[in-house]
């Protein structure tokens, strides 16, 4: 019998409601690899559910109370609400119902942990941290919020003592995670339907960092004003800072871009040394910043400079984070998850650094509430794009909000000074736009968290047809 503080191996079948979700599937995969019995349901099958079935999970298509037959515990995400037949069925049967973050915390108790939080950059930073630790021989277990190209999965089962996890702040549950090392990339107003106020959001991140043990460390980006303010509040815990600013402990210097590859040195001011000649095979200052956080932790764990340099140069990236999905007639097609104005601006700046020609941005706004709350920011975040095409809002279950739709955003972009913004209605419209507007050397960047990814992935074949 395992100790009472650890998840018992004989707990019985663990049922995930929405097992194909990017947040749930990684936990399920690690549980399967640890020998636990796992089952789950999703509204439809996917590559993720096929992978889990191949690892031994029982997968149900559709959500019904009878799927719970034999289950010992039910895991839900914050997206699962009362009225879901499996959640209601579990409670009617008296089954334990566990939130996703609580099950992740159970796994984390088996290891020492690095948890990556922040409004933007979590998934990429988690991947960078994982790949550095693999290169350093730590053999970590990884649970990420995106598909890591090196593993073709959002999870990795390692035999080492460390686990690397993405810590999701969207519902406040990241404060339940027992992190040994806490990374904070940035803090912006997002998921305010949960937090309610910027003060509550700040407190949430303060609590996240304060939860680390006395032997842990917080790694924070002081290029971001909110994070620098957070650092100023932290007492009784060790803090390592990173960024481009002259006061950061871990600082990037001599940054240049050649052919979409970042070249830079890393100044370790607290060690009085420099890791020279670093490269990262992706553009974007934000990606270099994310790499600095992983380097800060890697040095804390004792990794050597040459190991760090080699791991950064070999970084394989994450699905839907500036992912090249094709090149047709000299025009590069990029698929990216960016759906917040800060993310969009950073991605388009990276595109400008990587492109020899013009940048054409295609954006599908995600949620009416986000577009409404950040409308002026959306109107100002596309300046690095020569052409902007806006698709219909991906509602994600929300009702429309007056003044926060596709046409309003196009009008807002023009009103804010953009020279070429237009609406598109369909994939056919996108194809016509690209044929009309692009020439060899240009880059088309499709941005959003909804169905725009399918448009991006289908675009190369449409253009070849």
UniProtKB/Swiss-Prot annotation:
Compartment(s): Cytoplasm
GO terms, molecular function: ATP binding; UDP-N-acetylmuramate-L-alanine ligase activity
GO biological process, one term: regulation of cell shape
Pfam families, sorted: Mur_ligase, Mur_ligase_C, Mur_ligase_M
Listed EC numbers: 6.3.2.8
Keywords: ATP-binding, Cell cycle, Cell division, Cell shape, Cell wall biogenesis/degradation, Cytoplasm, Ligase, Nucleotide-binding, Peptidoglycan synthesis
Pathway participation: Cell wall biogenesis; peptidoglycan biosynthesis
Catalyzed reactions per annotation: UDP-N-acetyl-alpha-D-muramate + L-alanine + ATP = UDP-N-acetyl-alpha-D-muramoyl-L-alanine + ADP + phosphate + H(+)
Recorded superkingdom: Bacteria
Residues given in the record as ATP binding sites: 118-124
Keyword Metal-binding: no
Gene Ontology cellular-component terms listed: cytoplasm
Keyword check for Transferase: no
InterPro entries, A to Z: Mur-like_cat_sf, Mur_ligase_C, Mur_ligase_C_dom_sf, Mur_ligase_cen, Mur_ligase_N, MurCDEF_pg_biosynth, UDP-N-AcMur_Ala_ligase_MurC
Enzyme class: ligase
Family: Belongs to the MurCDEF family.
Function: Cell wall formation.
Protein's name in the database: UDP-N-acetylmuramate--L-alanine ligase
Name of the gene this protein is made from: murC
